[in-house]
Amino acid sequence: MTAKTIFDKLWDRHVVAGNEGEPQLLYIDLHVIHEVTSPQAFQGLRDAGRSVRRRDLTYGTLDHNVPTKDIFNIQDLISKKQIDTFTKNVKEFGIPAEAHGGKGQGIVHMVAPESGRTQPGKTIVCGDSHTATNGAFGAIAFGIGTSEVEHVLATQTIWQVKPKRMKIEFQGHPQKGVYSKDFILALIAKYGVDAGVGYAVEYTGNAISDLSMEERMTICNMSIEFGAKMGQMNPDEKTYDYVKGREYAPENFDEAVSKWEKLVSDSDAVYDKVLTLDVSQLKPMVTWGTNPGMGLEFGEEFPKINDDLNYERAYQYMDLKPGQTASDIDLGYIFIGSCTNARLGDLEEAAKIIKGNHIADGLTGIVVPGSRPVKIADEELGLDKIFKNAGFEWREPVCSACLGMNPDQIPAYVHCASTSNRNFEGRQGHNARTHLCSPAMAAAAAIAGKFVDVREIV
């Protein structure tokens, strides 16, 4: 019997039609939708007189456009229209969805796992690239376009060409103060933002096994910034423990686990490419430029331009120079949130550093839990008080300042330490300057007023 990767096992069992090397029709186990990429898809169904084929396998939430100060006071007309249209569509087509302001509302890539809908062995799609987050559970999960959203709504299938297989081994035990966010930023900095193009990435190694499910989701989330189609990990006891007891966990849980345990890569499975990264000596990462690959370990000097026009443009946009270091960046804003790092564990790590301290003069800091359940859990632990006492604003749970699509935008020309996943030009607002880092690094920077080595604090 031919040895297979977890990706091969899951892909092959979901093929409805087609041969490998050609477009294949895949069955989809979970389709998650939000207000930005679904309106045209629903209108397409309406125009064609079609219904949603599997409403029970579809799930929606509002996240991108929702304000975080007063979630019901939506001033932007386009945002309001998208939210109102989404609410109308899910009601008309009978799709289960979190109510605006409801107990389960949050970022789409967080509420699916938190509700127990994300499970090993599933194929999961959403009209959003960071759907790869769900791959941490041993699922095939990837983002799709709006026309594909319509196709999945109508047929519960999607045409795809099977990607190649890449294995990435994270080896070693990280130093205290180094987190999974640093793992993935280091990987992208070393190999580039296009190294994963055309691949389904499997993350493995003892450094992955040691991570919590929340930390694993951070890595799979940023598979897209690595250029990959998707990222996934083999399920284990941590995976099963996370899913167990959640609202949509399987009723016959032990039976489900016995099946999930078979959904792992065979030891002699063959990959098209294998990369390794030793994290034992890794330092905290900070990006300096305008893509996630422009990152360095703390203390390293920003690189020379060397006729690289992308670097030259990045330096101009960020108002930085070769030879400077992260500690030279004049920070004005701190954002702790996003589908990359707004889970309970992320905010707990940041709160440990913030507790008993105060945000530096001249800085604005906001903390935005990624979902209502996380916000409630944070407040039960008193984390909200820690942040507010330190001078942070404690906001309502949605996408927030990850992207300039809602009121939480970073002012022009202001440098922001951000726990999000993208630092493109204008990503957080017109002419905003984004520096990606871990929640712990962002918290330490908030206190010091500049980037510092969090290893000296934790």
From Swiss-Prot:
It holds the Pfam family Aconitase. InterPro entries: 3-IsopropMal_deHydase_lsu, Acnase/IPM_dHydase_lsu_aba_1/3, Acoase/IPM_deHydtase_lsu_aba, Aconitase_4Fe-4S_BS, Aconitase_4Fe-4S_dom, IPM_dehydratase_rel_enz, IPMI_cat. Pathway: Amino-acid biosynthesis; L-leucine biosynthesis; L-leucine from 3-methyl-2-oxobutanoate: step 2/4. One of its GO terms (molecular function) is 4 iron, 4 sulfur cluster binding. The keyword Metal-binding applies. It catalyses: (2R,3S)-3-isopropylmalate = (2S)-2-isopropylmalate. Gene3D superfamilies: Aconitase, domain 3 (3.30.499.10). GO terms for biological process: L-leucine biosynthetic process. Binds 1 [4Fe-4S] cluster per subunit. Its EC number is 4.2.1.33. Keywords: 4Fe-4S, Amino-acid biosynthesis, Branched-chain amino acid biosynthesis, Iron, Iron-sulfur, Leucine biosynthesis, Lyase, Metal-binding. [4Fe-4S] cluster binds at C339, C399, C402. Its cofactor is [4Fe-4S] cluster. The keyword Metal-binding applies. SUPFAM superfamilies: Aconitase iron-sulfur domain. HAMAP family: LeuC_type1. Belongs to the aconitase/IPM isomerase family. LeuC type 1 subfamily. Catalyzes the isomerization between 2-isopropylmalate and 3-isopropylmalate, via the formation of 2-isopropylmaleate. Heterodimer of LeuC and LeuD. This is 3-isopropylmalate dehydratase large subunit. The gene is leuC.
